[in-house]
A protein has these predicted regions:
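Active-site recognition of the HExxH zinc-binding catalytic motif
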Residues: 69-81
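Zn2+-dependent metallopeptidase catalytic core
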Residues: 4-30
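Catalytic zinc-binding patch centered on the HExxH motif and its immediate surroundings
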Residues: 33-55
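Generic detection of long, well-ordered alpha-helical segments
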Residues: 1-10, 87, 91
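Short, surface-exposed acidic
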Residues: 24-33, 107-112
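Post-HExxH zinc-binding segment in Zn-dependent metallohydrolases
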Residues: 83-112
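N-terminal low-structure segments adjacent to metalloprotease catalytic domains
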Residues: 1-3, 47, 59, 66, ...
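Short pre-active-site segment immediately N-terminal to the catalytic Zn-binding motif
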Residues: 52-71, 85
Length: 112
């Protein structure tokens, strides 16, 4: 699948509109910076705060489900930042939110 900024922004908007993510009160897509990452960065996706930025490597996502799972992963990092937790770690807070979202979406939590 071809992934561009418009697609990444649309996936983010769709995800934060779901009931499980809507309750987190995250900012709309227009308040987030989105970027396409080169494959040389050796990551699927990233989140950095101040300003909120989500980056995605198009070459590492062949299917929409992969992009959705990566976006959920980065949204969890963002949520941790907004709630005063470490956005860098996959700690207890990260794991609890990941499980809640995975259960709601019908995903294997280890794939998020």
């Amino acid at each position: 699948m071809k992934i561009d900024i418009k697609t990444v922004k649309a996936v983010y908007s769709m995800l934060i509109a779901t009931s499980v993510l809507r309750e987190l009160g995250l900012p709309p897509a227009d308040e987030i910076e989105f970027e396409l990452l080169p494959v040389s960065d050796k990551v699927m996706a990233t989140y950095t705060p101040d300003p909120d930025t989500i980056g995605v490597c198009p070459e590492r996502h062949r299917f929409l489900t992969s992009l959705i799972k990566s976006m959920v992963h980065e949204i969890i990092h963002m949520a941790n930042h907004y709630y005063g937790k470490s956005y860098l770690r996959h700690d207890k807070n990260f794991e609890q939110l990941r499980k809640k979202i995975a259960d709601e979406f019908g995903f294997d939590e280890n794939e998020i």
